[in-house]
Amino acid sequence: MTDTKIIASRLEALREEMRREHLSAFIFPSSDPHMSEYVPSRWEGRKWISGFDGSAGTAVVTLHSAALWTDSRYFIAAEQQLAGTEFQLMRERLDDTPTIPEWIAQQSKDGDSTEVGVDGMCMALSEVEDMKAELKLLGGLTMRTNLDILERVWTDRPSVPSDKVNIQPMEYAGEACSDKLDRIRHKLLRQGASGMLLTQLDDIAWTLNLRCTDVHCTPVFVSWLIIAEDSATLYIKGEKLTPEVVAYLKEQNVDVAEYDDIIEGLKAYGGYTLLIDPATVNYTLSQVRGNYRVVSAPSPVPAMKAVKSEAECEGYRRAMLRDGVAMVRFLKWLEQAVPQGNETELSVSEKLRQLRAEQPLYRDNSFDTIAGYEKHGAIVHYEPTPESDIPLKPEGFLLLDSGAQYTDGTTDITRTIQLGPVSDLHRRVYTLVLKGHLSLQNFCFPRGAAGTQLDAIARSAMWREGMNYMHGTGHGVGSYLSVHEGPHQIRQEYRGTPMVEGMTVTDEPGLYLADRFGVRIENVLLVVPYITTEFGRFVRFEPLTLCPIDTTPIVVDMLSAEERSVLNAYHQMVYERLSPLLNEDEREWLRIKTEAI
C-alpha cells in the first residue's frame, strides 16, 4: 500500500523546489534517458513521487494539485495505489479525460508561472515537441527541459547501475556483432545517413551481443551506442566492463567511452549525417549542437531485431521445452496444494519461480508474475504484494501470467486455471477467450500483413457477445532480452510493421469483469512460411509455448469443430514434446490434461 504521508512529504519538498525555480508544474514520465519501458531504479521518479508502480503512466504535479495518467491495463491498480494521496487518476483514451497540457492549463491560477518543467533526458523528442505546441496553444505556457529536479528532493536516489556486462554466445545469438553493424550501416546508407545514435538498451544489447542485469527482469545495460560508417563507440561506465568484454569489443571494432561523455561524443561527429529517431531519442540529446546533419527517421534496428536468426528460433524452442516442464510440474503441484488451504497468490508465484530456477540456463523471471485470484484476475496487470496478497480457495479462477529469462530465449505465458467449482458465467467467458486465442493461433495470412489486420480475429467471438478487452492482443518477445518487443504488435490501434517469417508475437486475448474475475490465455507464436501461390507468399503461426490449456471450464458446445481440432492438435504436440522430459507420474498427469475434447 502507498504510504500517503510519505507521498505528501515528497510533494511538499517538490513544490518548494518548483517555487524556487518559478515553475507552475512538473511532469514525471515513466521512462529513463533511453525511453525504456522497464527502467533502472534510478529513474523510477514517477513511482517515487506518486506511489504508482505500473510500467506505463505519467505524473504531473502543479503548485496546487497532482494527477496521474495511465492506460486501461492499470485503471484498477492505479485507483488503489493513489487512494488517500493528492493524485487524481486520469484514465487515458476516455472521452472525458483531458490531455496533460489541457489539465495543466485548467489548473493554472493568477500569478502562477507560465513555465512547465520536465527532465529533458527522460522524455522523447517527439513527445516534448507535441507537448510544447499544445501548451503554447492552450495558454501561452512554455516548457523548461534542463532541470532534473529529482536530484534535489530524492535524497536516497539510486545511482546508475554498475553490474558487469556479459557476452551472449554466438550459439544463441546466431550472428556476430560485426555482421550486425555492417547490416545496420547498409540500412543507414539507404536512409541517407552515415551514422546513427542508438539509445534504446535492448537495441544496443542485441547489436553488440552483450547482456547484463541493470534492469529488473530485463538483461540489458545502461549505455549509448554511436554507429558510424567507419567506427562504433559504446558509451558506458567503464567499471561495468570485464577484461574479457573489453577484448571482445576491440575484436568487434567497437571503441569504448564513458557513459556521461555522450554529449561531447556527439559533437565529435562533424561532417556526418546522423540518423536520430525522434520517438526514442531523449529531448536533451536531440538538442546537442554539433557540426553534423540530422536525418529524423525511425531506427532500423528494432525491425532487424524482431526477425530472429535460426539460432534464436532454435533457442526459443529449447527454452520453451524447459519452461513447459517447469509449468507442468507447477500445475500438477498447484492442483494438489490448493485444497490444503495454505497457498496464496504470492506463495504460488514463488513456487513457480523456484521450479523454473531448477531448469538449465535459467537467469531470472522475464517480468514480475501476475497471479490474480478471482477479483484480482480482473486487474489486468495485477502483481500481488504482501499487502494485497490473498489466499487461494478450491473454487474460482486463478489468472497466472508469468515468464522466464533463459540464456537461449525469453518466455511469456498466461494460463487461467480453474481451482474448483465455478459459475456458468466463468465458463462462458473462459470459452469466449479460448475461441479468440485458438482462432488467432490457427490463422494464415499474406506475408507482410500488419498486426492491426489480425487483431479482430482474436476478438470476433466476444464482440458478438458485446464484450471486449482494452489491451493489445500481441507483442513481440525478445531473445534473452525484453519480454515486450516491437515494432510489430497485434492491436486495434494502427501498427504498420509487416509481419514476416522469424518474428515472435504473443497471442493473449482476455476478458475482465471488474470485482469478479478475469480470464486471459497466452502463448508465444513464431511466424513461419505456409504456402506460396499465384497470389503471393502466405505465412502462419507456429506455437512455441508448450503447456496444457485448462479444459475443465470449457463449454464444449461453444467451440466449433475447427476450434476443437486446433486445441486437440496443440495438446497432442504439448504431450509429444514434453512427456519424454517428465517422470512417470508427471507424464500421466500431462496425458490426462491433454486428452482430446
Task: Name each model-derived stretch.
Residues M1-I597:
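Active-site neighborhoods and metal-handling regions in enzymes and metal-associated proteins
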